[in-house]
Amino acid sequence: MTSILKSVLLATIIVNLSSVKALADVTSQQVWDGLRTAMTASGFKITASETRKGDRLTIGDLQMNRRVQDPGSDASGTISLSVSSLQFLDKGDGTVTIVLPDQIPVILHVNSPEDGDFDVQFDLTQRNLVIRASGKPDEIRHDYAAEAVGLDLRKLVLDRTEVPGADVHADLSLVNVSGTSISAIQTDRNYTQNLNIGRMSYKASISLPGPS
């Protein structure tokens, strides 16, 4: 269980930072369409509402769901993210700013032949995250930076029994995160990623009752 949980937590942070395939010098609608296309290509099924006001496009009640598989075992399941509001702002200088909420709830459900079924609820958090898109339609550059990005465990359910909060603690923290992603359209769409992490820490403590 620890293996798939740790890998999914880290992958969730990286996917949400690096898969923002935005387009500059185009409309906010095209920026959102690019993000939605990239997330769909990553395996997510997406539903959301759209509201426009001036240069601001707001995506409300964004729900993202995809299947996950632990490559080291037979464990598989689903991961769901719920984003209350995602905003795209045209800065008027050929760049687009993407604004994410400070906290995004994530739910992971796993079926494991070895460990049984379990559900994990945690929050994807960020502090002072800035995402800026620029470039041209056939070569898109997006830069991002944050003081911190993390995942905090909120609930753990094993075989339909919730583990008391006092008995389970887990978090993953990335400090001083920055990076660049360039999307170039040639015959296919190619991505070049550069992710810098000042410090990463992961800790977990789980106390489970023994058999009665």
Show the residue positions of the predicted features.
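Bacterial N-terminal signal peptides that target proteins for export
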Residues: 1-9
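Glycine-rich, small/hydroxylated-residue low-complexity segments
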Residues: 26-212
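Sec/Tat signal peptide C-region and signal peptidase I cleavage site
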Residues: 19-24
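Bacterial N-terminal signal peptides
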Residues: 8-18
